[in-house]
């Protein structure tokens, strides 16, 4: 019995020791695992820290394509840009699960955005904005005529980006998170990103944090806010909000006050109306001294002195260096870009159904309506928009025959011959003709040399791009003189309207500015001319803006005007000029008048056409 007791005690002792040994080993194993987990998270933390640096480099280098962000982007805005880049960077990482790939995508986006903005600024003098994405096709169609040679800054910044791109291979060793962690992180980062972008678009947030909010000066806005923050702020304006206090019935009541009755007598013997919106036609003397070996627009300058049956002056546009379609929009509709997002393109964004315009109105009076452009039909969506504006006959480059070229474009001389051919063909219809022609000859850029163009006009500046531009303007001036000479000999009553769509880009204009501080609105002035082969009241130095010009032309021509045009004529007495580039106030100007105009424009552009279609 005693032996059995001793054996039991020994067994219990041995089992106890075994349990203690197992417990010690388990504790040691748990400690080791805990240490490994701690070390793992430390390693992940280090990798995450280095990945967090990637968006910072991406932001500053992207800005360096255009300027020095450390000196010119406001401090608070720099932090907001970095935060925006961080959110995008982390979203890419959690979506892909790979630091190396995500960082390369982020750098690639920064390079693409930076280079695109640089060239848009170079060629158009305004920054890249969200709605430029709608214009990608048009931009591609004319890209071959611009000089894309990279400057020193671009080369250096791109080389640094390439070096960083190569270094991202170090991230291949970075650990990965489970899909559960990634999914939760995607949702969290997405919510923060949406909330932050929304905050950037709020006026109170912009004011509190000293963000520059004025779309009127987009280049400065981008410079002090940074590209990413400005782009996020601009997203709020992709769609046009209803004006405060807007009511469709109230807009209709307001227009009804300007309605006039049109009788059959009013529509008898209506004149042909020919409108030529000439590509980049301008007189750069408005920017500074400009001396040349011969007058670059002798005919226009002569007409500006006060010719019989002629109205001349300067018309203020809303665009500079590009976005031709916005000038078309203002002239044809009577609407102003001042009430639409900066850089937006109504042809591509807003005109999706029948829209009131000069063409549609003249068609209702019995006119045959023609839209002509000696280039690709798809440019600015014209082939789809023109019919919605009331044009029944469309001519694009494939419809032109036996033409001459200047550089790579159909010449203005051939284009104006096409106008004459259209007029002659239209006579058989017995209807007056409304011909709206948008030329192409003078389109930028102006840096390349061509076998079919010699720069005959030479200025005091050592700038061949400027000399080429002035030579092109001289050719246009000759073509215009020939056109008016032809119609001065025809019996049919005809009125010709001629104006430029905008001034050329900074490559040319900055030469004449010659470093001087030029009033902003002068950069948006182009000459215009209204001439007839019958009696109209002549005038010179009569300045206006494109939204008014069509109504003023109809009045000069003796053609009845509709309610909206009558309203514009009334408004022009207190606000002689309204464009996205600014306003000119007259006697009796009142901010309430602008608010009324904004409401009526919204009705014309977004509501009136819907009512007719219902």
What are these regions (language model features)?
Residues 1-6, 14, 18:
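Methionine residue identity
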Residues 124, 130-133, 219-229, 233, ...:
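Membrane-interface micro-motifs in multi-pass membrane enzymes
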Residues 198-275:
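Membrane-interface segments at or immediately adjacent to transmembrane helices
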């Amino acid at each position: 019995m005693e032996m059995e007791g001793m054996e039991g005690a020994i067994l219990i002792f041995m089992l106890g020791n075994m349990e203690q040994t197992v417990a010690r080993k388990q504790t040691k194993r748990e400690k080791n695992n805990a240490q490994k987990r701690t070390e793992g998270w430390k390693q992940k933390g280090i990798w995450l820290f280095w990945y967090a640096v990637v968006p910072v480099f991406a932001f500053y280098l992207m800005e360096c394509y255009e300027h020095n962000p450390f000196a010119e982007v406001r401090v608070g805005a720099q932090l907001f840009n970095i935060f925006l880049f961080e959110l995008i960077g982390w979203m890419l990482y959690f979506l892909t699960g790979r630091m190396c790939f995500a960082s390369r995508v982020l750098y690639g986006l920064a390079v693409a955005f930076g280079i695109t903005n640089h060239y848009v600024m170079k060629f158009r003098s305004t920054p890249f904005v969200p709605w430029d994405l709608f214009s990608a096709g048009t931009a591609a169609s004319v890209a071959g005529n611009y000089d894309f040679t990279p400057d020193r800054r671009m080369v250096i910044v791109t080389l640094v980006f390439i070096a960083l791109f190569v270094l991202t291979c170090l991230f291949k060793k970075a650990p990965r998170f489970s899909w559960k962690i990634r999914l939760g992180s995607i949702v969290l980062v997405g919510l923060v990103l949406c909330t932050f972008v929304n905050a950037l678009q709020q006026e109170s947030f912009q004011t509190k944090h000293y963000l520059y909010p004025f779309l009127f000066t987009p280049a400065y806005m981008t410079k002090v806010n940074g590209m990413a923050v400005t782009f996020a702020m601009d997203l709020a304006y992709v769609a046009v909000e209803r004006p405060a206090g807007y009511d469709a019935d109230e807009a209709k009541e307001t227009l009804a006050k300007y309605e006039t009755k049109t009788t059959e007598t009013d529509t008898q013997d209506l004149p042909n109306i020919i409108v030529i919106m000439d590509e980049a036609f301008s007189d750069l003397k408005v920017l500074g001294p400009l001396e040349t070996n011969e007058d670059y627009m002798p005919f226009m300058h002569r007409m500006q002195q006060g010719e019989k049956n002629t109205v001349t002056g300067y018309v203020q546009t809303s665009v500079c260096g590009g976005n031709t379609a916005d000038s078309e929009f203002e002239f044809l509709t009577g609407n102003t870009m001042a009430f639409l997002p900066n850089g937006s393109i109504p042809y591509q964004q807003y005109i999706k159904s029948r829209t009131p315009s000069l063409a549609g109105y003249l068609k209702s009076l019995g006119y045959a309506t023609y839209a002509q452009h000696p280039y690709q039909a798809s440019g600015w969506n014209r082939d789809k928009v023109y019919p919605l504006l009331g044009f029944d006959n469309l001519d694009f480059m494939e419809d032109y025959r036996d033409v001459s070229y200047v550089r790579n474009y159909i010449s203005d001389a051939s284009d104006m011959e096409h106008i004459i051919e259209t007029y002659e063909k239209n006579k058989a219809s017995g209807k007056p003709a409304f011909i709206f022609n948008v030329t192409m000859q003078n389109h930028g850029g102006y840096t390349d040399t061509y076998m079919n163009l010699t720069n005959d006009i030479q200025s005091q500046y050592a700038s061949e791009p400027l000399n080429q531009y002035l030579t092109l303007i001289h050719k246009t001036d000759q073509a215009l003189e020939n056109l008016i000479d032809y119609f001065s000999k025809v019996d049919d009553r005809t009125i010709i309207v001629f104006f430029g769509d905008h001034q050329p880009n900074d490559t040319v204009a900055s030469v004449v500015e010659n470093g001087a501080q030029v009033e902003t609105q002068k950069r948006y002035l182009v000459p215009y001319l209204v001439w007839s082969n019958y009696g109209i009241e002549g005038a010179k130095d009569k300045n206006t803006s494109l939204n008014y010009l069509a109504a003023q032309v109809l009045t000069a021509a003796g053609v009845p005007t509709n309610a909206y045009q009558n309203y514009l004529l009334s408004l022009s007495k207190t606000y002689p000029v309204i464009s996205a580039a600014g306003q000119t106030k007259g006697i009796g100007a009142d901010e309430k008048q602008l608010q009324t105009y904004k409401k009526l424009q919204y009705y014309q552009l977004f509501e009136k056409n819907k009512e007719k279609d219902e």
